[in-house]
Every structure is written in C-alpha cells, then in structure tokens.
Amino acid sequence: MDIVLEVCDTFLFDPLYATLLPAQASSFTANATANATLSSIRQEPTAYALPHASWQYEPATKYFSIEPSKYAYMSSWPRDDWRRQALTLYLITWLFGVCVYYLFAGLSYLLVFDKATFNHPRYLKHQIKLEMKQANIAFPIMAIFTVPWFLAEVRGYSKLYDTTEKGPGRWYDYLQIPFFIAFTDLCIYWIHRGLHHPMVYKHIHKPHHKWIMPTPFASHAFHPIDGYAQGLPYYIFPFLFPLSKIASVAFFVFVNIWTVLIHDGEYAHNSPIINGAACHTMHHLYFNYNYGQFTTLWDRLGGSYRKPNDELFKRELKMCQDEWNKQAKAVDMMVEQVEGENDRSYQGEPESKKVQ
C-alpha cells in the first residue's frame, strides 16, 4: 500500500496538506532569508522558500519513482508522520473503494446485467437505491477497521517485498498468485459460513441477504462488520507470508472487481471449479450453500456445495415465469426457516410490507 500512498501523496495529498497545514519556517531559515542577498534568492529561491523537511524521500518501489513536488516539503505534517499516513490511508481506502464500486458495478449494470431480473417475483422495490445506500454506509466504516492493517504495511511490519531479489525467489513470484487465492478462499469459506450461524446471521449478515436477486450494486451492500470480516484474510496474508508490493495492489483491485462479477447475474460458465456468479446466485436464493469466494473446493469438502440449476445457463429458461415461481417458493421456505419474519418488500406487492 506504500506505492499507492506515494502516488496519492504526490498528486493529491501533498498540495492538500500544504494548504491546510502549512509548515512554519524555522528561525534558521528566517535568519538565512533575512541575511540573503536579493541575487542569491533569485538564483536559488527554493532554498529560502521551503521549510526544512524532517523526512527524506525514498521511492516505495524500484520499478518507478515519482519525484516529490515542492508541496511535499511545505506542510507541518510530513509524509512519514503516522497520523498523516493513517488519515490518508483512510481516505484512500474509503474513496478508492467507492470509485471501484461505482465504476465496475456501473459498467456491469450497463453492459452485462440482464434487466429482465427486475420482473423476478423476489426482486425488491427500489432495490438498486437500497443496495447503493447500504454500500455507502458500509465503505467509510469498513475503512476505519482496515486502516491499521495498511498502516502497519506502510511502516514496515508486514512481509511485503519489492523486487524478486528481496523476496523468496523467482519461483515465488508466480506461486504467490495461486497461494493467495487458495489461502483467502479457505479463510473466507469458514468466515462466511460462520456468518450464517443463527447467533450472527440476523445481526451481521442478513443485510447482504436482503437481496434475493442481486444486481452488481449488491456486491458491496452489506453490514460494515460483515464486509470487514470477509476482507480479513486479504489483510492478514502479507503478515503471515511474503507478498510482492505490486501483487498486493493488483489483488486489492482484483478482489473488489471479482466481488462485483459474482453478483452480476451473468452465468457465463458452468464450471465445477470456479465459484462464479451462478454459484453465488444459488447462495442468495438458497442461503446455506456455496460459501466460497473463488472456488467450489471448500464447499465440496464441507458438504455445502450446490450445483447451479441447469436452467441458469439457458436464457429462455432462466428468465421464464415457471423457473422464477419455483425459485420464489424455495426462497420463501428458506427465509421462513432462516429468518422467521420476512421484512422485505417485493416489486409488484402492495405498500403494506416495508423493507427495513
């Protein structure tokens, strides 16, 4: 995350902090400026205009560097102050998450999502607005819990490495990808399954299961603790195992995009291995199946795998009324079993039922 922090500092936060918290010139600088000749100031103006910096610039990666502008030295809050880093990382985590969410969920909605889903008997009234509202509530709160992990990374407490020479070797540069997927898939399976425990579900995980027929905007529409809990394996991994800095940033983006993809309702492949949109739709419809994030491995081993209905892969069948009615009947039974009272308000139903 130090790479992202460096880029954001250079182009956004250095000027912002320099404006809001300008540095006070030291007495040494003030005296030097007073004794300087006009010609010397003209020759080297920055020597007298900029306060003394308490930090030294070191590129976050050897693959590229961004020379700091003058603003990097003009704030009383230097780049290496942990409080500034924490605040900046909070804003990055929050705002970057929002941008990725709206960009990719929006693209998926426009280009991929089948709008016929709006006619499903278990599609909620004003569902997309409700999904966006829940996501907007979750992002800033999740960022609070996430910042300590990113701050620890930036301050050198993790096993993140920059170049191959700094890591275990070239072999690990390739192995870290399936290793990361396998580790996080295992952990998320058990975390997700734990969120379905009756003592936890109604308080934490139920908001995400409000969406029986999710749209791409349901991807991040969950309780903040729910989202943070399922993100923990990603944050923990670089403190347990080596991970390249570039891979860390790439995984951060990929995971957010993947979360959108498994909620887009486009059943592109009927894979027995990949836990794609079809498998995750089964989870939203039938609750207690397909807890995995990337693969079906742990669901198969844990006895919670449910093969997606064949009808999902045939458009003329997946959108037919008979299939929808069958799904609605099964959903109602599961809702009664898992939640008891159903407080959802479905499209086409009278206003007597309100989604809370």
UniProtKB/Swiss-Prot annotation:
GO biological process, one term: sterol biosynthetic process
Endoplasmic reticulum in keyword set: yes
Substrates-to-products reaction catalysed: a Delta(7)-sterol + 2 Fe(II)-[cytochrome b5] + O2 + 2 H(+) = a Delta(5),Delta(7)-sterol + 2 Fe(III)-[cytochrome b5] + 2 H2O
GO cellular component annotations of the record: endoplasmic reticulum membrane
Main localisation: endoplasmic reticulum
Domain notes: The histidine box domains may contain the active site and/or be involved in metal ion binding.
Homology family: Belongs to the sterol desaturase family.
Annotated protein name in UniProt: Delta(7)-sterol 5(6)-desaturase
Organism in which the protein naturally occurs: Leptosphaeria maculans (Blackleg fungus)
